[in-house]
């Protein structure tokens, strides 16, 4: 429903719906009323991103406007205290205060005019170049192994001097350089526009994917907010932050496949005599850097725009964008940048008193856990040891003693880990805990200082050098043909993979050995017969606490946040409940546009797709018959979700053998979600073309947790029905799940809980993982106010209050309850309701 009125002016570019106003009010009030945490669920398709932008930016501009007087009043008091003139008349103080406000306002006006001017000049220059057909390509041509004969010297690491004076001198020089830069920056800041220094409170918007962050930029372009002063036009100061891989414009560096290699290649290039052609010495003092920063603030630009701007100005976007951070009001950035303290320090991101917004937060616990977790296998270790030996044999005589000794130590540690894996692989089971001392038992590994070895790996950047050399040798064969290098994905590729090379994985694992914490555990896992040694962060609240403590307010937003209890239990257990505000809004669609049917049985067959019962042939036949009837009644697209690829394959094979699939195919063309993510787009395009262009029916068999359930939107005819088969519980016997549940139970007992309490909390955690996946999958179908669909939840457990209470609010309130105890009547009722639904709504 479109709202007639709004509680306050949020400067929404459109007339907001009631639920959008409710969400904006909830966000604004959470910040304004001093809550530390806000949890917000707003279904996908309800304009969530715009609501977040409008409420948070309206609060920020209101805060800046209301606090100008307070800040200038404090400044006046400081001036009079320092000058010992407290007896000045009040009217003199007010006049002085007014002059400061006016000067601040005038400086802001001056800066706004300056940004207008440089953006206009930039646009004019760009047009002239286009008219003259001058193509500005400042990038270097990619230097590939095939096209350029790189000197073997380029594969040597920097000389490493362990505990030597040379190392100390280098560290001292680095410290001196940093201090000089700090002082220069201080002087420069004095010379720049005063009274409009950095924004007092910043908004950090973080999301999972590059496309989601780009969508945020595009939504921000639609908005225009009240100024910090009256009678002033003030643009939104926004900067998107990205990785080197996204922002680097040096093709020599960009050509490296993965993030870590790009990072190391960039730093390696800077150490060379001539450095990088796009990064001037003392770049923060460069006028071109300042021009880049000012232009980046002059209008809303996304990552691609910054990349293009860097090419036009011949300056590095990755480093230059930092120049504008102080003036920025709102910054978008990927999860890794906000959650890793070291990354925030490198980027000089001060989150103190800031507003931090985490979008798509339904998976945030898993994201933080995976960022600080790692596993290794014997196959990986064998490949790394082989690569290290090849490299050492090649460059042995050219390596200095520090590099040579530490490389041998690295090989030794890898061999110890390999022996430990091979020795125990036959007698361990998933979830068995591993003690560090057991790894080095009966070996000399404990004599190796792993912390110093880590310092060597970090400072020498040798992992990147070895990876580059091995990649070169593997890309060359005697007949000149190319073959792919082996990466952490386990496969090979003819081009650089996005997966991290194995050596980086092993190094990350070694670092967990040097930074042991009570929040993590080492354990065994057995996945499809492959034994791995794992480290897992068990308490993500330790990472999240630092952010919560520093920030003014942390807002977690998502389309499917239910069940919300996990966030309170595992992300911020130390935050008092009166400092946490929760809100779940309904959907923009009319109530009659969505029906939800829990399907407990079909005719006289009960549905329960538990691990023990899911292969029952009678049940699979009944599911097939149910699906045939659905495909007859639902127009155009039907999307059906199964718990796993393996189970989907089993069901499809059963239906082929029993001719069920033939009957389904007579009603709708069948599509199946591919296991290879690179083929997903092709399948989706074919599925969409058949429905939207040829106006035919199709059914898409998908998997919970796959690409279809996470990032794909099935709007309009693409999903007139969504079917969820069973409850997609994760594997209860995986090493990760066994270790996590054991940790939850132990923690509950140590906090004074009973054994029953501990088991219930562990069960809740396991169940909530399942239900968040359900909510995420079924939320794919409704994308806008005029959309309509039916959701079928096929399993008797979906009819229980315990499970229904964990569905998203907008789904739960639309559940259709069948009152008859007759199975056949229930089946008839559901089919008749389906037919009536589409007859009426169409």
Swiss-Prot record:
Helicase ATP-binding domain mapped to chain residues: 6-417
KW ATP-binding (keyword) present: yes
Documented EC number(s): 5.6.2.3
Entries under CDD domains matching the protein: SF2_C_XPD (cd18788)
Ranges of biased composition (kind: Low complexity): 489-499
Name of the top EC class for this enzyme: isomerase
UniProt-listed Pfam families: DEAD_2 (PF06733), Helicase_C_2 (PF13307), ResIII (PF04851)
Recorded catalytic activity of this chain's protein: Couples ATP hydrolysis with the unwinding of duplex DNA at the replication fork by translocating in the 5'-3' direction. This creates two antiparallel DNA single strands (ssDNA). The leading ssDNA polymer is the template for DNA polymerase III holoenzyme which synthesizes a continuous strand; ATP + H2O = ADP + phosphate + H(+)
Family annotation (SUPFAM superfamilies): P-loop containing nucleoside triphosphate hydrolases
Any one cellular-component term (Gene Ontology): chromatin
Keyword field: ATP-binding, Cell cycle, DNA-binding, Helicase, Hydrolase, Iron, Iron-sulfur, Isomerase, Metal-binding, Nucleotide-binding, Nucleus
Cofactor: how and how many bound: Binds 1 [4Fe-4S] cluster.
Coiled-coil stretches noted in the UniProt entry, renumbered to this chain: none
Molecular function as annotated in GO: ATP binding; ATP hydrolysis activity; DNA binding; DNA helicase activity; iron-sulfur cluster binding; metal ion binding
Principal location class: nucleus
GO BP field: establishment of sister chromatid cohesion; interstrand cross-link repair; mitotic G1 DNA damage checkpoint signaling; mitotic sister chromatid cohesion
Residues that, per the record, bind [4Fe-4S] cluster: 248, 266, 276, 316
Cellular compartment(s): Nucleus
Membership in a protein family: Belongs to the DEAD box helicase family. DEAH subfamily. DDX11/CHL1 sub-subfamily.
Role description: ATP-dependent DNA helicase important for chromosome transmission and normal cell cycle progression in G(2)/M. May have a role in changing DNA topology to allow the loading of proteins involved in maintaining sister chromatid cohesion in the vicinity of the centromeres. Has a specific role in chromosome segregation during meiosis II.
Protein name: ATP-dependent DNA helicase CHL1
Organism, scientific name: Candida albicans (strain SC5314 / ATCC MYA-2876) (Yeast)
Gene name of the encoded protein: CHL1
């Amino acid at each position: 429903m479109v709202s007639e009125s709004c509680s306050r002016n949020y400067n929404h570019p459109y007339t907001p719906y009631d639920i959008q106003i409710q969400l904006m009010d909830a966000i604004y009030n959470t910040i304004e009323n001093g809550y530390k945490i806000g949890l917000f669920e707003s279904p996908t398709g309800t304009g969530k991103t715009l609501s977040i932008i409008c409420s948070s930016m309206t609060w920020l501009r209101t805060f800046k406007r209301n606090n100008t007087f307070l800040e200038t009043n404090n400044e006046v008091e400081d001036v009079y205290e320092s000058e010992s003139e407290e007896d000045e008349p009040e009217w003199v103080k007010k006049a002085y205060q007014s002059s400061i406000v006016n000067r601040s306002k005038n400086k802001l006006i001056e800066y706004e005019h300056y940004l207008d001017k440089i953006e206009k000049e930039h646009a004019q220059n760009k047009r002239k170049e286009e008219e003259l057909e001058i193509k500005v390509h400042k990038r270097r041509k990619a230097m590939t192994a095939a096209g350029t004969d790189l000197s073997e010297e380029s594969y040597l690491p920097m000389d490493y001097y362990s505990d030597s004076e040379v190392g100390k001198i280098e560290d001292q020089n680095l410290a001196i350089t940093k201090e000089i830069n700090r002082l220069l920056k201080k002087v420069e800041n004095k010379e720049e526009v005063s009274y409009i220094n950095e924004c007092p409170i910043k908004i950090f918007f973080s999301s999972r994917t590059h496309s989601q962050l780009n969508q945020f930029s595009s939504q921000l372009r639609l908005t225009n907010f009240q100024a910090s002063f009256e009678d002033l036009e003030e643009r939104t100061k926004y900067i998107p932050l990205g990785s080197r891989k996204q922002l680097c414009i040096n093709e020599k560096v960009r050509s490296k496949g993965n993030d870590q290699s790009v990072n190391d290649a960039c730093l390696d290039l800077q150490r060379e005599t001539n450095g990088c052609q796009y990064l001037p010495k003392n770049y923060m003092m460069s006028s071109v850097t300042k021009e880049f920063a000012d232009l980046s603030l002059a209008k809303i630009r996304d990552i691609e725009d910054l990349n293009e701007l860097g090419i036009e100005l011949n300056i590095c976007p990755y480093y230059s964008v930092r120049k504008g951070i102080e003036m920025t009001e709102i910054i978008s950035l990927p999860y890794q940048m906000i959650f890793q303290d070291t990354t925030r320090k490198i980027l000089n991101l001060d989150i103190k008193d800031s507003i931090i917004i985490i979008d798509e937060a339904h998976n945030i616990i898993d994201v933080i856990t995976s960022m600080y977790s790692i596993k290794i296998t014997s196959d990986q270790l064998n490949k790394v040891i082989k690569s290290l030996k090849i490299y050492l044999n090649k460059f042995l005589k050219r390596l200095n003693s520090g590099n040579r000794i530490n490389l041998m130590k690295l090989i030794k540690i890898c061999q110890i880990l390999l022996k430990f894996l091979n020795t125990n692989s036959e007698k361990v089971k998933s979830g068995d805990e591993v003690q560090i001392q057991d790894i080095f038992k009966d070996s000399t590994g404990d004599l190796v200082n792993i912390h110093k070895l880590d310092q060597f790996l970090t400072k020498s950047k040798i992992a990147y050098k070895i990876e580059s050399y091995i990649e070169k040798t593997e890309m060359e064969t005697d007949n000149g043909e190319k073959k792919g290098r082996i990466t952490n994905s386990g496969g090979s590729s003819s081009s650089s993979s996005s997966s991290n090379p194995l050596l980086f994985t092993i190094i990350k694992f070694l670092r967990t050995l040097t930074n042991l914490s009570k929040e993590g555990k080492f354990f065994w896992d057995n996945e499809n017969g492959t034994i791995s040694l794992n480290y897992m962060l068990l308490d993500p609240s330790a990472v999240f606490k630092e952010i919560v403590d520093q920030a003014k307010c942390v807002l977690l937003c998502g389309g499917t946040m239910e069940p919300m209890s996990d966030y309170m239990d595992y992300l911020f257990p130390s935050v008092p409940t009166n400092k946490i505000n929760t809100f779940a809004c309904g959907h923009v669609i009319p109530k009659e546009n969505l029906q939800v049917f829990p399907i407990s049985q079909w005719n006289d067959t009960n549905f329960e797709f538990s691990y023990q019962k899911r292969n029952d042939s009678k049940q699979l036949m009944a599911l097939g018959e149910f699906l045939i009837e659905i495909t007859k009644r639902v127009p155009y697209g039907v999307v059906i979700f199964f718990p796993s690829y393996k189970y989907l394959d089993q069901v499809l094979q059963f239906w082929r053998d029993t001719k069920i699939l033939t009957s389904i195919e007579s009603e709708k063309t069948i599509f199946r979600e591919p296991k290879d993510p690179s083929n997903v787009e092709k399948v989706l395009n074919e599925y969409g073309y058949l429905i939207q262009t040829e106006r035919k029916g199709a059914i898409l068999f998908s998997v919970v947790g796959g690409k279809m359930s996470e990032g794909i939107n099935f709007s309009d005819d693409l999903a007139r029905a969504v079917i969820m088969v069973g409850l997609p519980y994760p594997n209860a016997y995986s090493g990760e799940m066994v270790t996590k549940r054991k940790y939850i139970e132990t923690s509950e007992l140590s906090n004074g809980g009973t054994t029953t309490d501990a088991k219930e909390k562990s069960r809740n955690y396991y169940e909530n993982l399942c239900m968040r996946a359900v909510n995420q999958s079924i939320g794919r179908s409704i994308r806008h106010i005029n959309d309509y669909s039916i959701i079928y939840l096929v399993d008797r457990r979906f009819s229980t209050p315990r499970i229904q209470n964990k569905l998203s609010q907008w789904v739960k309130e639309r559940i259709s309850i069948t009152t008859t105890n007759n199975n056949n009547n229930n089946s008839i009722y559901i089919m008749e309701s389906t037919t009536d639904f589409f007859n009426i709504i169409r």
